[in-house]
């Protein structure tokens, strides 16, 4: 028997309400009480990294990755909102897609992923 998907992502925040509002504003993640956010079906990568990875800041134990469509348009909106966006052509590959990285207001690392078109 196997699990059928990820049912939630839970993490500590200094100001949970303000951080949830940031995710609602910039990512469309809506939570009302414990009413789940409905997301589009798609691939999910579950992968431990070596403890000395430089894929995200050492002070953080995790990084969340969000699937997005039209990455360039999404990044443009984030930049217009004053969010620092990092891209690197070395992160992108035809077989895996395109990537960008940002941090939320509390410094949590976020990777944005536009999967390859099939």
Language model feature labels by segment:
Residues 18-20, 63, 99:
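Secondary-structure boundary/capping motif
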Residues 15-29:
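Amphipathic alpha-helical segments
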Residues 10-12, 65-67:
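Short hydrophobic/aromatic beta-strand micro-patches
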Residues 14-16, 69-71:
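Helix N-cap motif at beta-to-alpha junctions
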Residues 1-5, 11, 32, 75-118:
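Vicinal oxygen chelate
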Residues 5-7, 60-64:
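Short amphipathic alpha-helical segments
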Residues 27-62, 102-105, 109-116:
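Conserved short beta-strand elements that form part of the metal-binding/catalytic scaffold
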Residues 22, 72-77:
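Short amphipathic alpha-helices within nucleic acid-binding modules
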């Amino acid at each position: 028997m196997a699990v059928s998907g990820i049912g939630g992502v839970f993490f500590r925040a200094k100001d949970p309400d303000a951080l949830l509002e940031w995710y609602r504003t910039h990512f469309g993640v809506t939570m009302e009480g414990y009413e789940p956010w409905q997301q589009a079906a798609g691939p999910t990568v579950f992968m431990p990294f070596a403890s000395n990875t430089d894929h995200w800041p050492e002070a953080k134990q995790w990084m969340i990755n969000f699937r997005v469509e039209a990455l360039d348009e999404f990044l443009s909106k984030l930049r217009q909102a004053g969010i620092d966006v990092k891209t690197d052509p070395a992160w992108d590959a035809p077989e895996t897609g395109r990537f960008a990285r940002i941090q939320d207001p509390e410094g949590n690392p976020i990777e944005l992923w536009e999967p390859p078109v099939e």
